[in-house]
Amino acid sequence: MLAHRTAAPDPSLAAVVLRQAPLYYDDGADPATDRPAYVRAGSSLARVPGGIALVQDDANFLAVVDPGTARARAILLPAGNGGVRQFDKGRGNKADKLDLEACVAADVDGETLFVAFGSGSTSRREAVVVVRDWDLAEPRVELVHAPGLYARLREEIAFAGDALNLEGAMLCDDRLTLFTRGNGSARGESLPAAATCTVDWRELLAFLRDPGVTPPPAPANVLRYELGLLNGVRLGFTDAARWGDIVLFTAAAEASPDAVEDGAVEGSVIGVIGADGDTRWTPLVDEGGRAFTGKVEGVLAPHDDAGHLFAVVDTDDADAPSVLCTIRLDGPWQDQRNARAAR
């Protein structure tokens, strides 16, 4: 039987945006590689040697960000048609973007392996980027075309619904959890829903090494989530990160018509999935308690006891930088028992 979880807002939690830092490249713009002076998009975050790796949905650059200075080093990803690395409606090439939306970094055989996933919302967006050799001046980048993996995920209708749209990934031991947004349309009796599934990490790595021969891992442990509404707009997952025994997630209330087009954003929430499955969230606010209306696309769990996390806001504006936010978490985020008592 398909498992469902229902999330609820939790008044005992708070997520306060303390700092908003626009992201710029150390070296400025580079017309030769079609790179603007700023990190124009932001989809997901992971810690790598040298900083925080940030993937972008509509620009073929990996940005390695120093969170203290908000300056970034650019790592080139393969160019698209015509040698371009920026994609948007203004250029008329939005359909050609890789749409990288989720990423993880892990120690594999003594080195950091970074893996970023296309959303799978169209056939063009069925690629996986693998980056290794971080000790080199230019880490080694491989673009793996992975239609077999995405076809396998789409076959799991409870997970993918009518329109697969991967938005987050989280690694725990040998299982990779994938998060889908849930903003597509109905597929028969299957309504769109935010959902998760797991795949075997080692099987995935074997597939990425030889996708023409090795079968993709099968999705398992599908969970569908009803995250609720924010200002009347349905919430959908945008990213997730492990923090001790719990899962932190971000979700946005975006009135998009489908898994491809953008829509008006009503705001974002930070949520938690406890070890017992209890799922709750709180809207993001600024230090004055006012609603924070940015579209949070990526999250990185706190690295110490300070309880501050990083999140990236994508402005969906080709002429503006994405923004790295520092967020303070207040309340019983890691204590489900006290949280339930407070509710």
Placement of each model-derived feature along the sequence:
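Sequence/structural signature of beta-propeller domains
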Residues: M1-R343
